[in-house]
Regions:
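A short core secondary-structure module
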Residues: 165-209
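A short, Trp-centered hydrophobic/proline-enriched beta-strand micro-motif
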Residues: 125-138
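Short glycine/proline-enriched turns and hinge-like loops at secondary-structure junctions
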Residues: 73-74, 144-147, 173-178, 192-195, ...
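Flexible, small-/acidic-enriched active-site or ligand-binding loops
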Residues: 204-235
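Alpha-helical interface subdomain recognition
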Residues: 1-88, 112, 157-162, 228, ...
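Hydrophobic, small-residue-rich alpha-helical packing segments that form membrane-like cores
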Residues: 139-141, 147, 162
């Protein structure tokens, strides 16, 4: 019974970290978010100032162990931080969620030499961010399911390393990262689950260039971009784990990726809920505030239920991912995001309805949150694919 307490009782460290994050959001994110979101050039939505300020207060590196200059936050605390960031802006939450998550993976998956080469440099650089290259134009959410196709981005063995050709797209932090974990097909004729290798990739490697920055409907304070490889040589010492066994790294080292995505979108749901409550107190209809109308009151309570339930699911998944001996269940690595994103989308539409016509006007700020709320219906796996994956885990023949 003692084991489950951390999910329900916030400790002093967590409280202090979240206060720091909330102050950072209020000072650095909230004042800038609308303006950055409105810039028509998608690359300009990204703010180096925000990243540098996050570095100053220790957010950027918090999942690094103290040995590497971080706080060594566990997955539960990290999820709380990711949600708190998203209350200020979804894109800001996503750029740090990716970086914090990949820093966790690197400390498990990289060998000692690779860690010594990468982690101190990442920790020192106030703009240092991380990215993971999986998604391709032809291979999207189907990588969550055992699928017979290979990755199209492929590598040929050569003396001392590999020659990589191909392209990744929709990559979060793709144009901003200094280090990448890149998943590439190294064995022809095998499905991606059997013939892919994970490489450590540096930003300045010859033959690797950034393609376009995607012009997204929402989540615009995060950049997503194409990674292009033209005869890019990656040396053998950059192979992560074993050649051909790259796919295992995803499942083995990072079961809580899904819950982190869920935490980002739950932060957006929280921001929408707060906006709906504030408006319902302010807006007079039929001679009294909206919040005194039973239908609206009940709906605000239902929003609260959906947010609390999503958060509990996320916290349980994160805690058990770090303590799998206490009953980790693989569906916890798939379903929290599906639940949280459905809840957030429902809350977004309700918030817009409660605002009436004002919810459709840009200057009230609801429209931005609605665009952001749509992002995770597909991000980190299309929900339908995730339900199928969960079913395959539940009913494995």
């Amino acid at each position: 019974a003692k084991a489950m307490e951390p999910i329900f009782i916030m400790n002093e460290d967590q409280r202090a970290i979240l206060q720091t994050v909330a102050r950072f959001v209020a000072a650095e994110v909230t004042p800038r978010a609308a303006e950055l979101d409105a810039d028509p050039d998608p690359a300009n939505g990204y703010s180096f100032e925000i990243v540098e300020k996050a570095h100053e207060v220790g957010i950027r590196t918090m999942t690094l162990s103290e040995q590497w200059g971080g706080l060594g936050t566990d997955s539960l605390t990290t999820a709380m931080v990711i949600e708190e960031l998203a209350k200020g802006d979804l894109g800001v939450s996503v750029i740090f969620a990716q970086t914090l998550k990949i820093a966790q993976i690197m400390q498990k998956a990289l060998n000692a030499e690779q860690q010594a080469r990468v982690l101190p440099a990442f920790a020192r650089d106030p703009r240092g961010m991380l990215a993971i290259g999986i998604t391709e134009p032809d291979n999207a959410s189907n990588y969550f399911l055992p699928y017979p196709t290979p990755f199209r981005t492929s590598a040929e063995k050569t003396l001392g390393g590999w020659i990589v050709n191909g392209m990744k797209h929709f990559i979060s932090n793709g144009n901003r990262a200094s280090y990448y974990l890149l998943f590439v097909q190294t064995e022809k004729g095998k499905p991606m689950a059997e013939g892919a290798t994970c490489f450590l990739l540096e930003r300045d490697r010859p033959g690797f260039t950034i393609g376009r920055v995607h012009d997204k409907m929402g989540e615009r304070l995060a950049n997503n971009a194409e990674l292009v490889f033209q005869d890019c040589f990656i040396p053998d010492e950059n192979v992560v784990g074993t050649a051909g066994a790259g796919f295992g790294i995803l499942g083995e080292f990072f079961p809580q990726s899904n819950a982190y995505a869920a935490a980002s979108i739950t932060g957006v749901a929280g921001a929408l809920h707060k906006k709906a409550i504030d408006w319902a107190k302010l807006r007079i209809q039929g001679g009294r505030p909206l919040i005194e109308h039973d239908g609206i009151r009940a709906q605000l309570a239902e929003m609260r239920m959906l947010i609390d339930a999503s958060r509990s699911y996320i916290h349980r998944a994160c805690w058990l991912a770090d303590h799998q001996e206490h009953g980790w269940d693989k569906t916890l690595g798939v379903l929290p995001k599906a639940m949280a994103s459905q809840a957030a989308w429902k809350i977004a539409t309700w918030c817009m309805e409660i605002h009436g016509g004002h919810g459709y006007m840009k200057e009230f700020g609801v429209a931005k949150l609605v665009r952001d709320a749509a992002a995770f219906l597909h991000s980190d796996g299309v929900n339908r694919t995730l339900f199928l994956k969960a079913a395959n885990l539940m009913f494995h023949s």
